[in-house]
Amino acid sequence: GIPCAESCVYIPCTITALLGCKCKDQVCYN
């Protein structure tokens, strides 16, 4: 997928989650 410029190591995807991004390998991907 496309990296969403947000990490999800300590907290889940927040802003980018609204854009359909999901956590994968500690990084939010679209």
From Swiss-Prot:
<comment type="function">
    <text>Probably participates in a plant defense mechanism.</text>
</comment>
<dbReference type="Pfam" id="PF03784">
    <property type="entry name" value="Cyclotide"/>
</dbReference>
<dbReference type="GO" id="GO:0006952">
    <property type="term" value="P:defense response"/>
</dbReference>
<dbReference type="InterPro" id="IPR012323">
    <property type="entry name" value="Cyclotide_bracelet_CS"/>
</dbReference>
<dbReference type="InterPro" id="IPR005535">
    <property type="entry name" value="Cyclotide"/>
</dbReference>
<comment type="similarity">
    <text>Belongs to the cyclotide family. Bracelet subfamily.</text>
</comment>
<feature type="disulfide bond">
    <location>
        <begin position="8"/>
        <end position="23"/>
    </location>
</feature>
<protein>
    <recommendedName>
        <fullName>Kalata-B17</fullName>
    </recommendedName>
</protein>
<feature type="cross-link" description="Cyclopeptide (Gly-Asn)">
    <location>
        <begin position="1"/>
        <end position="30"/>
    </location>
</feature>
<keyword id="KW-0960">Knottin</keyword>
<feature type="disulfide bond">
    <location>
        <begin position="4"/>
        <end position="21"/>
    </location>
</feature>
<dbReference type="InterPro" id="IPR036146">
    <property type="entry name" value="Cyclotide_sf"/>
</dbReference>
<keyword id="KW-1015">Disulfide bond</keyword>
<keyword id="KW-0611">Plant defense</keyword>
<feature type="disulfide bond">
    <location>
        <begin position="13"/>
        <end position="28"/>
    </location>
</feature>
